[in-house]
Structures are given as structure tokens and as C-alpha cells.
């Protein structure tokens, strides 16, 4: 009892010491998160379970959103501790579900706009991520190979000291990490007023899944002491590296002074006064004497245990029948028993004797088992008779039996093996009640049959004794039967039924017919007899006299049925198929005329040939496939019409495209009918495809393509950076895009004012950052180097910018070639460049960037195709491309004769090219006038991206309209677009305000593809492309964000951009400005501005220096939209079918928002109107 009292005193002293105020100089400071949130045993969102440490509670996280935050005052205490120690030590024991991502700890803003700091265990990547929200960006520091989400208990120790972080898992030291700013910059002193500390709760889908225990912040100690307390013997060596390494010249942040939970009343913590504590110290001195006595007793017990252990270590012995035997010693007890000693255990084994097949066996001296001895006597083979059995009846008459056995293997035996006799013990006393009893069973009877299945029977009598004086009769059956089986009985055969009579041998005059039967009812078996009788039977048939046949003279038409009557008359049936008549006279039917669509009609010709009899269809025309029916009669022709379909090698498998290429069907009029195109991740001519890492359409290695086919078969001169134009100014085999010095003048391109001209002197007279060697206006400042007429003389110094022969000061369209200088509205701006040629508007203001001046822009567009009604050549039929091939002012979409040759479009074999003669030499349905060039633009259909639009033949963004979406303010620069590859590649080089680069080609249905690449690791914002562009307020946009982030300016609306690909429709009531800017940044819907059609649910952001390939399909007629993004050869994101009919087509362009060095390479658009 004294010992227990002393231990209790020690415990109270420890509790008081561990809760002292900072001035008391304690050596430990612990902030247990689960204690701080109130209730360390239970609470919402968590359930108490058994943990790794049995002395402290563990919690299974069921719903982290319900777990309350740490109170503000406690959080403020913790912040003060962080500032005092310039860091912290974070401890946690966890058992995390396998391959999950979960937040251990997070500091989130109270306005729910995001997290400021979080510690996340990323089981999918095998890392521990520290996320810090810094001004203008977010830093994520990942400790690699932190395998925590294994389903097993793990213990982490995270030591953060200013801008350094060191992680320990159990006793293993992981790699260290460096923060962009000291930790005090994140854990500011006023942080508790704007943020709260949460445990296990993270962003969407980032809540912790598993069990947590001992989640604590520790101050006033070192990681070395913590790891040593955990039993990590090597913790000293592990920690010396970080403790002795001064960061940025500062002293170590973790000090030994204690900062714990604040309190004002010491006695409230300890529960004892100082006098009481003093008396406890005196009691402890008495306890010391008791402990010393206890130590002496324990020492004596220890010595006795040692003696007992030494005694047990002696060699084992065995004792048997009073005799001592050594270990492994063997001895014999008698002739049938042997024993041995094994580890102090006596094991004995008896000899097992076999059963002897004789009655005269004896055991020889010294042996254990008996032996049989031979005998020649017939009686010697028998064993002695057994004792008689008890009498079967206890009173009255009964029977007794005895038996003997014969050694038939060694002797011959004669006589019976069983003897039976009657017995009579006493007379039955019939004066008292007696229950009946069964006698012994009789022997089994012989089988009831001699063959097959039968039964055998045995009986017993109720006479042992018999019931008397109303005694109970015997219970049970008096007879017992069981089956017996003999050899199978023979089965005699039996006849089956007769078959029907067969056909008579003649129809008249007496003939014979026959029938038969089988011996199968049953079939003879097991020696049974065969059937008796005949197998077949005959009888006379058709005994009547034969009539006179009038059809023997063939009076009917060949193939018509002839019916003869007994009186010699006859009658003809219908004409055979393919003929018509009365059966006597028949003529051929012209199936081709009677059924005008029996065969394929091509170019107005019914491809059917009549024969006598019948008809046959001609083979399907060239480039068509189908059946070639033939037959007789109108009914056959109507039921078996010929169908010829245009042949499609892409579906019938007759193409020769590479397995890594896609077969694109061009139509049966094209020659060839298909084009092979390598899939994303591959490049080549489609027949041969090779690996293409940067997705710019050029293979990593040279390909052996067909003769003279070098396009996209040569090795990529920049295999890791998209450059679809393969520009190489100095011809050194390294593309300009990845060549640091394109002109070999020893001046790096990023500092060379003429990167493509050798100019080591770098002279720049006009100081426009364009060297004199390559400056198209060397004496006029013009950094943009604009040259409208492409004559080598820049616009800044040209006297005639557009090259129309009219000097600039007298030219009413300085940038547009217009010799006639027509100016209908007399506003000083020529009609060729006037955005309102019929209304006076010298300022040319165009607020919505739709190429229509505000003066004449009414934005009334009933068919939503981007062209207002009074300027739309089909105001009631959507036709965004405004195609009008006969230039009659009526668009092709609503013109029944597009080429004005007098042949309606539905019968014109050249719909866009005048050919009133409709000449078609090869009969393929395509007129000679438009053979292989349907729109007559001198570009073969196989190479024409829009074969039905004369105005569009190739992808070209060399001319584009720059559209700022936030034109006011100077927070960032305007986009800077660099054009390459004849307009098929554009690069945006600066961090800029939101803006578009929109081409001038207009489309209805379109496919748009290209390669997306970010060539920098700076920034993480938006880039993408637009389609269906009609104005700066009306367009579709596909935009991609790398990481989730709130826009820095919350006015006029808060904007939260989530990582991942988005498809949005812009229909802004305000147009470009801060409202549209914030709405574009925001992932979601903003009324009156932007509506999100789809966002990637996996929130996958783009990666730096990684090539992606996009494919857009837009069909305005049905509203179908689909965006697919490839990463290498695999699909990374797929929107699936989206349906939206807001806009019926428009222009294509590119989009950037606060993101630099965006490459749009190998771009390609194709019309899909037909």
C-alpha cells in the first residue's frame, strides 16, 4: 500500500509539472489537436477505435466535414508558439486506406475561399505534400517516397524550421524540402482572425480516410528527443544534420523553453496546494526505504531463478519401473515390448502380431507371435467348438448354437461349421404379466429369383419370451427384406410397329408397294431369342386400269403445267415465271420496264438488262459496291431490288493505312477515296507512322516512306518541342525553335536583335530592338515590323503601305489595296476597308469586334449565324460561312442553283461549277467540269480542307484579329503573338490580360485540331481556343487551367478557377471588361456573362513542357460539340457529346489569360458541311 501511495504521488507531481505556465521552465509543450477541439473521447464526424498506442485515444474519421475546428483562442496560442520557436514539430500516427489521398491538417480561410496551409498524404503518388498559399501563387512541396497510405500504422515526425522541412516516417529519415518563404510568413500572428485550423478536412475529395492518433504540435524540444522516446536508436545521428545546419544565417528555431496551454491558476491545474506538495515530498523519502527493501527481495528471487534454470539445463533422464535410463537409451521390457528415453519422456512400443489362419497355432519360446503347424488329418483343420450360445428363450423351448472355423488354407475340412440344439431352461410361469421379446433372426433365405433383381428374407419370432398376462407385444418388424442381384435374365426380341406403305410402283394397272418393321420392341439381350416372322411385307396397289393421257403430245408451253383427264382431254396451267399468256402461248415479260427500280439507277440510267426469259442487273458502277440480282418475273424483281452503295475502304477494310493511323473517308468521287492520317503520338504519311513525342506531326526518327514522299517522314529537328514548320535558318539540323543561336553569330537568340541574320555587331540605329541587318525600317522605330504589302519595306517607313500606287496621305484605305478609292458614304474611309460602307462613320468604332461598325451594327440575327439580318445572304437559314459561289447575293444555303447553270442542285453533277452540258465521261456521277476539284479553287479535293468552299483551301492564321477581353487597366500586357509555319503555328510569349487571336475564315460545321504546349514552368493559368466566334460578347471557348486558384481581384464578382479542361459559352451583356474577365476565370456559371457547358470531373491540369493534342468537333445544325484532349497516344480528357445551339457557327481562334509561352502548333481546321 505504501508503494501504491508513492506512485500516486509521483503521478500527481508529473501532472502538475506538465501543465505549468511558461515561466515555470517546463521542458515539454504539446498541443493535442483532438483535445483542443473539445472531447478527446468522442465527437461528431469521428468514432473512437483501438489504436496503435493503447494509452491514448484513436479515431476513425467518418466525416471530416463534421469535425469542428480548433477554437480561435487555442489556435492563437499555437500561433504564438510558432512565432516564439520560428517553427514547429508536427506528430501524427495514422492508418490510412490504401492508395487514397487525404489531408492530415489544414488551415482554411473562414470565408471558404481556399486553404492557406495543408499537410496532405498523397497515397496515389506516394508523397507527403505541404501546400502553401503565397501572394499570387500557390506552392506545393512534396516529399517523395512517403509511402503512408498502405493500410498499416505509420508514425510521422515533421520538423519545420523557418524555410526548411524535414520528415521522419517511423525511425526513417526522408528527404528534406525547402519552402519559398519562412513558415512564420504563413502562420502570421493575426492568422486566427481570418482562418481556422482543421484536422482531417481538405479540399473536394481530399478528406482523410482512415484512423488518426496522437495528432499534436510540439514545442520546446528537439526531434532527437522525440525519436529517442519512440525507441529510434539512431535518431541522434539522423538529427545532427539539420540541427547543426544554420538556415539563412539564423539560429536553430526549436528552443528548449516550454510554451503550452495557457492558464492563470496553478492550483486549478494541479488540484493541490504547495503545503500539500511539501508533505508529499516527505512521504517520498519514506517511500525510498520501502523501495530499497523491495529491491533486495527481487534480487533474492532472481538468484533462485538462476539456480532453477541451471538445474533445468542438465541432461534429461527417464525413470521406468524404478530403473533410471539416460537420454536416447533403449531397453526391452519383454518379448513383445521395447522402450527408449527421449527428452525425459519414456516411449514404449508393442509388437503387433498378424492373425494366424489356423486353429493349432502356438507361440515358440522366446518369440512374441504364434505360428501355424501343418496337419494331414481332416478333423485337424477345424478349430475346437465354441461354447453354446445362451438359450434363445428364458422359459419354454428355445435353441442354442455353437460354431467352429476351418483352416482351409493349410487343411482340408469336412463337416458343418455350425451346430444347433434345442434347449429348455424352465417352464414359463403364466401367472404373472410378461412382455414379449424377439428371438434371434433366422438365417437369410435364398434369393427370390434365379436371374435379375430379387429379394432375400429373414424372420424372427416374438417368443423370447412370449407376451402373457396382457404383456406388451414385441416392438419392431418380424420380417426383414433386402435386395439381391443375380445375373441378368435373357430378353427375347419383339417386333416394332410396321412402317407406312411406300409409294406404289405404278399409278395404274396394278403395282407393288412395300413396308417393313424392326426387331426392337424390345431388342434381344442376354441370350434372348430373335423375333420370329418376316421383316418386310408386300401388297398389290393401283389395280385400276390406266386412262388415256392427253398431255403426251406436249400441248402446253414449255414450263407450263399440263393436266390430263380420263376421257383424254387436257388443260394447261399458268405460264412459267418471266412469261405472260394462256399457258399454250406465252411471251417474255420485260421486268426492267415493269419494275423501273429493280436495278440501280445511276446518272439517269436504269442499269437493268432484260433476257428471254427473266432479267439481270448490271454490276454496280465503279466506286460502288452491292449485289447483282437476276431472276424471272415481276414478283422476283420487286422483292430483290439491287442496292449499290458508295464504296468506303475505311469501313470495308480495303485501305492500306498503318495500324497506328486513322482512315479518313473523302467520298466515292475522290481519287483516292480516302486519306491516311497518323493518330496522336505518331507521325508520318499514314502508310508508315513513327513515334512523335512532341505531337507536332514530325517523327522522332526518319521514316522510309514511298518515293518522293518526304512530308512528315523526315526526322523532327526539335523532337521535344513542337515546331510543325520545322524552320531551320542556319541549316544545322537543329530547328530554330530549339536552337539557341539560329544565325551562328555567337549571340544567343534571347539577346540577339536579329536572331535570323548574322550580325555580331548588333547595330540598332532606331533602338526598336530589331537590328539594322533585319529591320525593314532601320531608321524608324517599329518593333512590330509590320509590312502590309510584303515588299520588304515596313509600314512605318513606306510611302505606300498597301502597294496600290496611291500614297498614304491620299489613300483612303492605307492598309487595304483599293485602286478605285471608292467611298460611297463619303466619310473618308474607302469602301474596301469601311466597316459601314453605306453609313458615314469616320471613327470606324467597332465595340463588339464583329467587323461591323457601331453605326450600322443592330445585332439583329434571327438565325444566330453571326450575320445580322440586313447583311445576311440567307437571313432565315443559318450559314455562318456566307458561301455564295455564283455571287448572286443569295447564299448557297438558300439558293436552289448554286452555280447558276440552270441545273437544280439536286440534279447537278457539279453543284458549284457551271456545266449545263452535265458531261460525265467516266460515268461516276461527278461531272468532268469539277472532277477532283469540286469547288474549282485549283486545290485538289484530297488536299482541300474545305472542298465545297472556294474561299477556304488551307489552315492559315497569318491574318488574325486581336481582341482584348479586358482592355481597360494596365495590370498586365496585351498578348504578343508570333506566327510560324505559314499560319499553322502561333506562339504567345508574354504573361498577359485575357485576349483572343481570331482568324477571318468562317465556318458552319467544322473540325479543329492542334498541339498545345506550355514552354515554361512559370505561372499556372489559362490557355485554350475559341470556336463559333461571332463577336467579343458571343463565342464558345475551350480553356484549360493548371491549378485551382482564385482570381486576385474579387471585383466585380468573386472568381474561383478550378484546374482542368472547361467548355464554356460566352453570351455577355456587358462585353469586354472586368465583368467578362472575372466570369471567364470562374469555373461555373455567371448570369449575363458565361455558362459552363462541361468541366473535366477529374480536374487534371496541364503540365509544363508536355505536348497535348486537342480535337474539336462542332455541328451547329444539331448543336453537337465534343472536345477530346490527348496526352501522347492516350486520351487524357473527353467531354463526350455536348449539345448546345446558342450559336450556329462562326470563326476560330486562340485564347490566353495570364499565361506566357503557349505554343499552338500543327493546327488544322476542316469543313464538315457535307
Swiss-Prot record:
Induction of the gene: Expression increases in lungs following short-term hypoxia. Expression increases in kidney podocytes in response to elevated free fatty acids. Expression in vasculature, including arteries, increases in normal aging. Expression increases in adipose tissue in diet-induced obesity.
Chain ranges of the TSP C-terminal domain: 958-1170
Gene3D superfamilies (UniProt xref): 2.60.120.200, 6.20.200.20, Laminin (2.10.25.10), Thrombospondin type-1 (TSP1) repeat (2.20.100.10), TSP type-3 repeat (4.10.1080.10)
Knockout consequences: Knockout enhances eNOS-dependent arterial relaxation in blood vessels. Treating the endothelial lining with THBS1 inhibits ACh-stimulated vasorelaxation. Mean arterial pressure (MAP) is significantly decreased following ACh treatment. Enhanced survival of full-thickness skin grafts, with increased numbers of functional vessels in wound beds. Significant increase in proliferating cell nuclear antigen (PCNA) in middle-aged (8- to 10-month-old) lungs.
UniProt region (Disordered), positions on chain: 840-934
Compositional bias per record (Basic and acidic residues), positions renumbered to this chain: 883-894, 917-934
Glycosylation sites: 248, 360, 385, 438, 441, 450, 498, 507, 553, 708, 1067
Region (Heparin-binding): 47-95
Domain VWFC residue range list: 316-373
GO MF terms, alphabetically ordered: calcium ion binding; extracellular matrix binding; fibronectin binding; heparin binding
Region listing for Involved in retention in extracellular matrix (ECM), in residue ranges: 531-1152
Signal peptide: 1-18
Family per similarity comment: Belongs to the thrombospondin family.
Subunit and interaction comment: Homotrimer; disulfide-linked. Can bind to fibrinogen, fibronectin, laminin, type V collagen and integrins alpha-V/beta-1, alpha-V/beta-3 and alpha-IIb/beta-3. Binds heparin. Interacts (via the C-terminal domain) with CD47. Interacts (via the TSP type I repeats) with CD36; the interaction conveys an antiangiogenic effect. Interacts (via the TSP type I repeats) with HRG; the interaction blocks the antiangiogenic effect of THBS1 with CD36. Interacts with ATF6 (via lumenal domain).
Disulfide links within the chain: 171-232, 391-423, 395-428, 406-413, 447-484, 451-489, 462-474, 504-541, 508-546, 519-531, 551-562, 556-572, 575-586, 592-608, 599-617, 620-644, 650-663, 657-676, 678-689, 705-713, 718-738, 754-774, 777-797, 813-833, 836-856, 874-894, 910-930, 946-1167
Domain TSP type-1 stretches: 379-429, 435-490, 492-547
Name under which the protein is recorded: Thrombospondin-1
Domain EGF-like as annotated: residue spans: 547-587, 646-690
GO biological process: angiogenesis; apoptotic process; behavioral response to pain; blood vessel morphogenesis; cellular response to nitric oxide; endocardial cushion development; growth plate cartilage development; inflammatory response
Domain Laminin G-like: 56-270
Each TSP type-3 repeat, start to end: 691-726, 727-762, 763-785, 786-821, 822-844, 845-882, 883-918, 919-954
Compartments, as annotated in UniProt: Secreted; Cell surface; Secreted, Extracellular space, Extracellular matrix; Endoplasmic reticulum
Function: Adhesive glycoprotein that mediates cell-to-cell and cell-to-matrix interactions. Multifunctional, involved in inflammation, angiogenesis, wound healing, reactive oxygen species (ROS) signaling, nitrous oxide (NO) signaling, apoptosis, senescence, aging, cellular self-renewal, stemness, and cardiovascular and metabolic homeostasis. Negatively modulates dendritic cell activation and cytokine release, as part of an autocrine feedback loop, contributing to the resolution of inflammation and immune homeostasis. Ligand for receptor CD47.
Residue window of motif Cell attachment site: 926-928
This protein's UniProt keywords: Angiogenesis, Apoptosis, Calcium, Cell adhesion, Disulfide bond, EGF-like domain, Endoplasmic reticulum, Extracellular matrix, Glycoprotein, Heparin-binding, Inflammatory response, Repeat, Sarcoplasmic reticulum, Secreted, Signal, Unfolded protein response
